[in-house]
């Protein structure tokens, strides 16, 4: 029996569909990208406050009655998070919106269903670069 020390999470996946969060977190863990999941913006902010190792937030655009895009402003307005250099990736099921969202938020947008290789490559690139949005 081996005692594996789990690496601190680097990525926070935010989606209101529990199965999607679980699948993406499991996928990222398989490729050595430690991740955690949240199902709402409130959950995401609480996790970001508690887990300082997170560097990238991968968030669905539509979260029940919330807009996932609001996470950038909520982080900026949070005294504990405002100075944190987080990077963002948004995911949308609306194929007509990715370019508009990317231009408005100045961050990458992936169209659902998200292609695993594309997501993994993008997250690795964001973790490797020093640029952040916010």
Residues covered by each model-derived region:
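Non-catalytic signal-transmission and effector/linker regions of two-component phosphorelay proteins
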Residues: 1-12, 18-25, 77-85, 108, ...
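Conserved sequence signature across two-component system core domains
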Residues: 14-15, 38, 57, 91
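Short hydrophobic/Thr-rich beta-strand motif most characteristic of the beta2 strand and flanking loop
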Residues: 32-41, 47
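Acidic catalytic/metal-coordinating carboxylates
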Residues: 39-40, 67-75
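Active-site residues of response regulator receiver
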Residues: 60-61
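The feature encodes the CheY-like receiver
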Residues: 64
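A short, hydrophobic beta-strand element within the central beta-sheet of small alpha/beta folds
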Residues: 82-96
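As written
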Residues: 101-110
């Amino acid at each position: 029996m081996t005692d594996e020390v789990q690496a601190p999470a680097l990525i926070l996946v935010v989606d209101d569909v529990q199965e999607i969060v679980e699948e993406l977190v499991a996928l990222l863990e398989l490729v050595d990208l430690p991740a955690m999941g949240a199902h709402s913006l409130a959950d995401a902010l609480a996790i970001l406050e508690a887990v300082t190792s997170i560097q990238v937030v991968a968030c669905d655009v539509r979260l029940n009655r919330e807009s996932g895009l609001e996470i950038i402003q909520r982080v900026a307005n949070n005294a504990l998070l405002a100075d944190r250099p987080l990077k963002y990736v948004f995911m949308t099921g609306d194929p007509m919106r990715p370019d508009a969202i990317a231009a408005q938020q100045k961050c990458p947008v992936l169209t659902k269903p998200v292609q695993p290789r594309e997501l993994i490559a993008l997250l690795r690139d964001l973790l490797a670069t020093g640029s952040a949005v916010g």
